Amino acid sequence: MTPTRTRHRHEHRAPVAIAVLVNLGLSLLLPSEVLFFPSWVVPVLGVLLLIPLVVFNPRRLTRETTWSRWVSFSLAILLTVANQLTVVRTIEVLLGGQADGGAVLLTALQVWVSTIIAFGLVYWELDRGGPVARRRPELWTSDEADFQFPQETDPKTATWRPVYLDYLYVAMTNMVAFSPTDTMPMTVRAKMIMAYQALGGFILLALVISRAVNIIS
């Protein structure tokens, strides 16, 4: 998180697009045992939603309309729902103990990474109305902030604005620490989503550790 970002410099499209493509690529590699539908469904839907967003804002996120906002948020919801369905199936496989140990641990790692990417997108879309709205001074200083970053409390970084990688970091630390670290959730919806993510991450990690111990022993 760099303090040199200004409110006037709009966020770059590339990090978000790459994260989405990584998520879609991971879903293609998942075994059928942890999928509710064919492996190509989510990648195809994801690409269909991503293409118009890239065409609309190819380099930086400078424009936003009602339809682009809905498409962008729908993409985040698609990846999150698909990921959580996969988490449920992965937990079932881990509890069943029937699948190959190494393969199921690799699957759990793929699901874990996908969870971080998906929830990072949700936080990114949710906070202060999304990436475009956050560049508007009146929305940034409103009382509707879902997250408070440490840079906001430092007068030296008054013009700093978060980008997707900051929210990705929030999602990652929530999966590892099972609680907020340097960035605090400020609204009920942000707290509930983070609590849900942390709970799912805790269950998944506990089962993975248990399965790994069984394999070693």
Language-model features, listed with the residues they occupy:
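Structural signature of hydrophobic alpha-helical transmembrane segments
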Residues: 15, 37-49
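N-terminal membrane topogenic signal
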Residues: 4-18
